[in-house]
C-alpha cells in the first residue's frame, strides 16, 4: 500500500487537532490480527494540501516514532491510530526512541519501554517482545518490515550469521508479508485540496467515529479557514 510507504518515509503526520495516540496493547493485537487474517482494517482520510498551506502549522511533528525528514506531504484527518501503530511497528532493535515526555500515556504504556510488535517464527505467533529479545536465539521479526523485502531480507541475512533459520520459518513469514501487502484499507486522499475543502470532507466523510467535533476541527485550522462557515450548533 502506498500509504504504508509514505508512513515509513515520514511523509504523513496527524492533523494538529487530533487527540494523542490512544491505542493500548489489545488494540494493537486486534489491528495486526485483522491484517494477518486479511480482514478489512477500516478507512483512512488524508489531506494533501495545496501549496498555499503551511503543513507545519496544521500537522503534528511526528507519527509514532517517525519524524518527517523535511516537510510532510500529507495530513492524516482520520485513521491516525492505525497508521501510528504501523509506524511504531516499523521500529527495529536499537532504533532511537522519541523523548518519553513527548509520548501520550498510551504510547508510553505500549511502546515506551522499547517493546516491539513481532512475528515469532519459533512460537509461530504475533506478539509483543522487548527489542533485546528480537536479537535472541530465534528468528523474531518486527511486524512492520515483513512486507518489505528491502528491509526484511537484510535483517534475515544478518540473523543467519547468528542463528539457524529454517525454510519453514521463512515460508511462515512470507505468508504474513503477502497479507500486509494485500491489506484491505479504504484510503481517501484529498489531493491539493484547500483547507475549506478538507473541512468539507471531514464533515461528510469522517463524521462517524471521529473523536472530535466540527468546532474542534474549525478551531484548530481557523487561521486558514477565514471563509469557512461556522460549525452548526447541536
Residue map of PLM features:
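Basic- and aromatic-enriched surface patches that contact anionic nucleotides/nucleic acids
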Residues: 1-25, 29-234
